[in-house]
Amino acid sequence: MIHFLEQYFVELVTVTSIIYLTLAIILLLYKTPDTAVYKTFRRSKRLMAGGMGLISLNIWIWIASFTGSWTEYNNWVPCFDIILFYLMSICFSFSLSSLLDPHYISRKRCRAIAVKFTLTAFFALIAMTDALKAYQLPLLLIALAGLLEMLIGHIYYFNKCYLRSNALFENYFSNEKSHFIRWLKVSHWLFYGMLILGVISIRSGALINWLLQFYVVGMNLYILVNIINYADEYETLMKANVDKEEEEKMGEASPKKAFIETLRPRVAEWTLEKSYLKEQFTIDDLATKLYTNKTYLSTFIKEEFGMNFSSWIASLRLEEAKKMMRAHPDAKLKDIAYNVGFSSLPYFSSVFAKSEGVTPSAWMKEISRNKEE
C-alpha cells in the first residue's frame, strides 16, 4: 500500500494543485454587489483566492524539487515552506479577520506585517547558504518563530473580533445571528490545522502527505461554499457594526432622566402591542418606531432590564411561548416557536433551556403533570 501511495503521489498533488487553482479562479470570478458596503468583502474574497493560489504554488515548487525518492530530502523545501506558509497566513488571516472587522487591514498593520515577513524570509533564505550551513537549524528555527509570532497574534485578534461581532449582533438583531459567522471560526482553525499538518508532512512519508491533500481540498471547498453563502447576509450583518465616528459623537453616556421617563411608556406600549412577535427586526427598526436612536435605546434596555437587545426580545418571546404552552399543551413546539418570533425550533429550545434550566418539552410535561395532580 505504501509503495502505491509513493508511486502515485505526484499525480495526486498535480490534481489537487489544479483543484486549488480552480477554486481560486471561481472565487475571483464570483460576482458581488458593486457597492461601498461590499468593498471589504471583495477584498477579502481576493485575499482568500490568493491564499488558495499560494497553496497550489507550494505544490508545484515541491514537485519541481522532488527527486523521486522519499528518503532524500531537499534542504530548500523547509525554507520555501516557511516563506509560503507566512504568505498564506497573511492571505487567510487578513481575509477572515476583515470579514469580521472592516477596519482590520490598515496601513499600520500592513507595514508591520511587511517588516516581520521580510525578517522571517531573510532568516529562512540565509539558512540555505553554504557559508552558514553550520547554523542552518537555528536560523530556520528563528524563521519559524517569526511565523509563529504572526499566527499567535492573529489568533488573539481574531478571537477578540469574533466575540465583539457576536456582542454586536446580540445588541442589534432580534434573532440569533451568530451562526452566520460561525464558519469563519471553523475556517480559522481548519487553516491552522493545515499549517500544523504541513509542517509535520515535511519529514513524513507518503501516507501523511496523502491525508494532508484530502484535508486541504476539504478545507478549501468548505471555505469557498461558505464565503459565497455569506455574501447574501454580509450587508445585513454589517449594519450591526457601529460606525466609529458616530459612536464617538454619540458617546456611551446614559440617556438623561427626562428622556428615560419619555421612553419608558413608549416601550411599554410597544410591548403591550406584542410587536416583538414579528420574526426579525433590528434595534434600528425599533428605535425608529419609538422616535429615538439605537444608542439611547440600547442604553435604556441595559439600564431598565439589565440585558442586551437580543436577550430582552428573547425574554419577551419566552413569556409569550410559556403562555401558549400552558393554554395549548398539545400544540407542536415548532409551531409555538414560529408563532412567538423565533427563527427555528433548535434556537427556541436553546434559549428556553438556558432561561428555564429544562427543555421546552420537559417543561410542558411538568405543566401537564401538575394539572393532573
Question: Where do the PLM segments sit?
Answer:
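N-terminal low-complexity or simple alpha-helical regulatory segments
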Residues: 1-122, 138-142
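Extracellular-loop-to-transmembrane junctions of the mid-late helices
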Residues: 3-19, 126-160, 203-212
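Alpha-helical transmembrane segments of multi-pass integral membrane proteins
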Residues: 37-57, 113-117, 138-201, 212-221
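Alpha-helical transmembrane segments and their membrane-interface junctions
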Residues: 60-75, 192-209
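Hydrophobic alpha-helical transmembrane segments and immediately flanking/interface helices
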Residues: 73-92, 205-228
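Alpha-helical transmembrane segments and their immediate juxtamembrane interface regions
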Residues: 91-110, 216-241
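Membrane-proximal linker segments that couple transmembrane helices to downstream signaling/catalytic modules
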Residues: 228-339, 351-354, 361-373
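Key DNA-contact positions within bacterial/archaeal DNA-binding proteins
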Residues: 295, 345-346
